[in-house]
Regions:
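Conserved beta-strand
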Residues: 1-2, 7-21, 39, 49
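Short, conserved post-Walker A segment of ABC-type ATPase nucleotide-binding domains
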Residues: 23, 34-43
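The feature captures the beta-strand-to-loop junction immediately N-terminal to the Walker
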Residues: 26-28
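ABC ATPase nucleotide-binding domain signature region
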Residues: 41-82
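Conserved ABC nucleotide-binding domain
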Residues: 94-112, 128
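Hydrophobic anchor residue at the start of the ABC signature
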Residues: 119-121
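Walker B catalytic motif
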Residues: 136-137, 142
Length: 175
């Protein structure tokens, strides 16, 4: 059983075994949803108990934007792929270009907020991840993009563990 606290106890005596599939985490603000995802992804450590974090291919996405300002969306995507040692196939590139409404050559600095968040989300299409943790990022993009992401995640649910936090009602279809 693990525990995690800050000024107050966020998670106490939790024990989880999570199978492959898609899971939605719900709760009030400050209830520990983000902390739980960070612990599971290995980005935070438990205060007490055994640490049973994942050690395979993990994608963790939150509301932080991942881009570098002077580059295009495509150049930023290449930087991310290089950091994860991902080689994109022609089909992957085409799917990602469609995800960006064929605007992958646009400058990251002038892109909309939703497009900037799509940069991290596009990694969902780049690889078959063992674990995907999505913390609120889905609420920042348009309905068409959510539909594309939902279809991709549903296609991965037999081989991946996908856990997401979202207040966007469009995402209820994932479960």
């Amino acid at each position: 059983n693990e525990s995690k606290s800050y000024d107050k106890c966020i998670l106490k005596n939790i024990s989880l075994e999570i199978d492959k599939g898609i899971y939605r985490v719900e709760g009030e603000n400050g209830s520990g949803k983000s902390t739980l995802l960070q612990l599971l992804a290995g980005l935070e450590t438990f205060d007490s108990g055994l640490k049973n974090c994942v050690s395979k291919d993990v994608l963790y996405l939150d509301t932080n934007q991942l881009g570098v300002v002077p580059f295009t969306i495509e150049e930023n995507l290449q930087l991310l792929c290089d950091s994860f040692q991902i080689h994109l196939s022609f089909e992957d590139k085409e799917q990602i270009n469609t995800f960006f409404d064929n605007k992958i050559g646009d400058n990251y600095m002038t892109a909309s907020t939703g497009t900037k968040f799509k940069l991290g989300l596009s990694l969902i299409f780049a690889k078959n991840w063992d674990y995907i943790f999505i913390d609120e990022t889905l609420s920042t993009v348009d309905a068409r993009s959510i539909d594309m992401i939902a279809k991709r995640l549903i296609s991965m649910k037999e081989s991946s563990t996908i856990i997401y936090v979202s207040h966007n009602l469009l995402n209820q279809e994932l479960i």
